[in-house]
Structure formats: C-alpha cells, structure tokens
C-alpha cells in the first residue's frame, strides 16, 4: 500500500502592539493588535494510519507539551464536519508553550490548512474553534491588524517594511488563561485604552516601522502584570 507522507511548515507570530480594551459577553476579551508572522520554524509530518489503529497518534519532539495538544482539538472538530482517517503526526516543536508567540496556533493552522485541501466550502474549518490566534495564520500574510478575540483579521497588503527581529524566550511560560486572569485582577473592567485609541496606536506603530523610525518599547498590556510575576523580565529592557 502506498503511504503518502505530508510535511508541513508551521509559523509563529509577534504582537507588535497588544491592547485589551474590554471583556465581552461570551467571556472572551476584546483585543486590538498588530501581528507580524515569524518565519516557519516548526514542522508537522502527517501520514494516514491505515493499520489497526482507530485513534490518532501524535509524537512531539523538541519542546514538551503538557496537557492536551491543540492538534487533538483540531481533529476532534474536523471529524464533526468531514471524514478523516486516523493519522500519525510527528510535531517538531522549537518554541516553548506559553511563550506568547502563538506557535501552538501555528501548528493548528497548518493542520487545518491541510485538512481543508480539496474540501467543499461547507466542510472547511475556519479555525476560531481551535484558538484565538489561529485565524491570523489562516487568513493573513505577514502583517495584519487583528481585533475581536482574534477572529477579525485585516491583512495588510500594501508594501510593508523589511522586518528583522531577535526573539528572546525566557525559561518560564504562562498560559493564556493565567495571563488574562492577572490582567483582569489588575484592571477589572476598566482597561488602559479604548478601541479607538488602540487602533490609532497600532497605526502609529506601523507607520513608524514603515519609515524606519524608532518607536521605543512596543505597547503591550501584559507587560506590567508579567513584570510583577517575573521581575527578571525587566532585564530584557
């Protein structure tokens, strides 16, 4: 039997701005952000498992994932809309979970894109169910304005600056739920910036980057709460 092995690249991202402007009725927070996609630095190898297995097998190398893998959630959601053989997936992780770079969402988006190949529109997955950052990886190019809880993606297709970055990842990580819990404890329902000002701010950051101008410390509402939890964070700045 011929087995087709599919090798997929998986990206991560940077939040060049990240403002939380309120809490929604569905429990999620309202965001305004400028996203930049980092080069593909992780990979998935996928092959159908036509043997006796009735479950998927996911092998992870590189970094350790504790708890449920987001790829399991993608496959569970996919099978509600489409037929999917049991799969054998090898995921090579480079970015530690809880780093805020969205690498797990990048993994999910890579798998969703593969699952959506040659599917009818009514079968395709949108990505919102898997995670708030997933729509960006599915809909955008390198740059995008992102709003809502992450589902509203406005790709920026005009000529964009060449962007080089040095990404420093600390030895500790923090779950998204924990980070938002700390933020809510600090601000309650009154966050530092409203939606209009957050949109103006991200546009200003983008314009300065396009003009090769220095902006300074990029705005991120999580900075102060993370600094309180991990004072060594300040050494980076």
PLM segments and residue spans:
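ATP-binding N-lobe of GHMP and related small-molecule kinases
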Residues: 2-99, 116-120, 158-160, 169-172
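Gly/Ser/Thr-rich beta-alpha loop segments that engage phosphate groups in nucleotides
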Residues: 24, 29, 100-108, 149-150
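Short amphipathic alpha-helical segments and helix-helix/interface helices
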Residues: 32-35, 124-127, 237
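Residues at the starts of beta-strands that form the adenosine-phosphate
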Residues: 43, 124, 164
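Conserved, helical-rich catalytic subdomain that frames metal- and/or nucleotide-binding sites
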Residues: 55-56, 139-140, 144-237
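Charged catalytic carboxylate motif
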Residues: 70, 107, 232
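DPxDG-like acidic metal-binding loop motif
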Residues: 99-124, 128, 136-140
């Amino acid at each position: 039997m011929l087995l087709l092995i599919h090798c997929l690249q998986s990206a991560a991202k940077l939040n060049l701005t990240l403002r939380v402007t309120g809490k929604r009725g569905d429990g999620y927070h309202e965001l305004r952000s400028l996203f930049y996609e980092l080069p593909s630095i992780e990979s998935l190898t996928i092959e159908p498992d036509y043997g006796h297995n009735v479950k998927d097998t996911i092998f992870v190398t590189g970094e350790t994932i504790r708890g449920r893998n987001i790829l399991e959630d993608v496959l569970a959601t996919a099978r509600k809309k489409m037929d999917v053989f049991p799969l054998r997936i090898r995921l090579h992780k480079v970015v530690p979970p809880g780093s805020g770079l969205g690498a797990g969402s990048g993994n999910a988006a890579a798998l969703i894109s593969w699952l959506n190949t040659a599917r009818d529109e009514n079968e395709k997955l949108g990505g919102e169910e898997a995670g708030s950052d997933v729509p960006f990886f599915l809909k955008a190019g390198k740059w995008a304005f992102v709003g809502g809880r992450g589902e509203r993606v406005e790709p920026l297709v005009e000529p964009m600056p060449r962007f080089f970055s040095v990404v420093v990842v600390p030895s500790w990580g923090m779950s998204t739920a924990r980070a938002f819990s700390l933020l809510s404890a600090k601000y309650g329902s009154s966050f530092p910036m409203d939606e209009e000002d957050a949109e103006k701010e991200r546009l200003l950051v983008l314009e300065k980057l396009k003009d090769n101008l220095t902006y300074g410390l990029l705005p991120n509402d999580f900075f102060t709460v993370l600094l309180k939890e991990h004072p060594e964070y300040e050494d980076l700045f």
